[in-house]
Amino acid sequence: MTTDTIVAQATAPGRGGVGIIRISGDKASDVAMAVLGHLPKTRYADYCDFKDAENAVIDQGIALYFQGPNSFTGEDVLELQGHGGQIVLDMLIKRVMEVDGVRIAKPGEFSEQAFMNDKMDLTQAEAIADLIDATSEQAAKSALNSLQGEFSVQIHELVEQVTNLRLYVEAAIDFPDEEVDFLSDGKIAGSLNRIITKLDSVQASAKQGAIIREGMKVVIAGRPNAGKSSLLNALAGKESAIVTEIAGTTRDVLREHIHLDGMPLHIIDTAGLRDTDDTVEMIGIERAWAEIETADQVLFMVDGTTTDAVDPREIWPDFIDRLPKNLGITVVRNKADITGEPLTVTQDHGHSVFKISAKTGLGVESLQQHLKSLMGYQSNLEGGFIARRRHLEALDLASSHLMIGKEQLEVYLAGELLAEELRMTQMALSEITGKFTSDDLLGKIFSSFCIGK
């Protein structure tokens, strides 16, 4: 960990009412003496002049001094709050850097120092960047929950449960004459199943948190001329796709990025799926399947004039069989303006079924509400936490090790192998909070932060 004293502008670049310069490190008190002529009382606002080396006033403002470890970074911290003109702030930073041992901070270095000094864990540090980058109220609330430790608490509870079970299993191994009795008495199996259930719940919440942060990818798929492009236009609120009566008009992937009550939604319109000898259309269909395989949800567009069915497997079994196993499906029966069907929303075989007219827009608002609910939209903004892809990957890895460990217990009564899988589970979970994390990963995470954070 660096021992340098770092400085950066904490407020956004450009013109503003107030501009803040943040200094952190052992030289913070030296900076105060050089720029202010005195060391402010700890944790008190001090209105004073900010002066250059010739004792000329650069600016006037408020100085705040926090003595480590009682500061954001855990080090001595000085904040200079002056006027928000960029020239003045640049002059002030230049003056601060005249003090020996002070350098410009790297992106995210203040948060990194806070992490290194155990002022926060890695999920909380990431939540700072996510709160700054939030594109919706729900994302901001979820990021704040993570910053306050909601996600961390869930992970710490899991790690503690896994650790306790691992200790129990290893104790059984230490008494080989009784090991089989320990492993088969049901206590270990019960504890393991409770951990798996808890992890499943955290995974579900984390997946929702990732969607809130990154947006949900929704692919509109179906046969040609089912109204996919009309639905894209209706959801986007503009003519993004060409719509004709000719089947196969859309031959490539069309993308629109919209917000529903601030929730980010990535809509993908795809080529109609059918057997064809047309080379260009075949390429479009291949791209359509590539998008489907990475989607969070599929809107299965059905031409309501061609069938009365609502069960997707009855409508097109080959299509359903090819979909990824855990991919969510929403059935959209289109052309209600022609069929005269009531604009209803029903559940059939575990799938939501919407009857709409993409052309006229009838029923589209209900579909939008459905998509918002899938993204985790809550009008009261309560609960939930933000999550990143790396968190999901670590949770998936932990789940995989637990399932392997369960097999070692139930099939082979192999205590040593179960203990090893529990150790690997513990490592995967601890990587989320940063207890066991490579320096390369830390560098990648913090380098994505703003300078001054």
Swiss-Prot record:
Its subcellular locations are: Cytoplasm
Alphabetical GO CC annotations of the entry are:
cytosol
Name any one Pfam family assigned in the record.
Answer: MMR_HSR1
The record's annotation in SUPFAM superfamilies points to: P-loop containing nucleoside triphosphate hydrolases, TrmE connector domain
Annotated residues that bind (6S)-5-formyl-5,6,7,8-tetrahydrofolate are located at R22, E79, K119, K453
| Top-tier EC class | hydrolase
Q: Which residue ranges does the record assign to the TrmE-type G domain?
A: 215-376
Please give the coiled-coil regions recorded for this protein: none
Q: Where does Mg(2+) bind?
A: S229, T250
Cofactor dependence? K(+)
For this chain's record, the cofactor binding note is: Binds 1 potassium ion per subunit.
Cross-referenced HAMAP family: GTPase_MnmE (MF_00379)
Matches recorded under PANTHER family:
TRNA MODIFICATION GTPASE GTPBP3, TRNA MODIFICATION GTPASE GTPBP3, MITOCHONDRIAL
Q: What does this protein do?
A: Exhibits a very high intrinsic GTPase hydrolysis rate. Involved in the addition of a carboxymethylaminomethyl (cmnm) group at the wobble position (U34) of certain tRNAs, forming tRNA-cmnm(5)s(2)U34.
This chain belongs to the protein called: tRNA modification GTPase MnmE
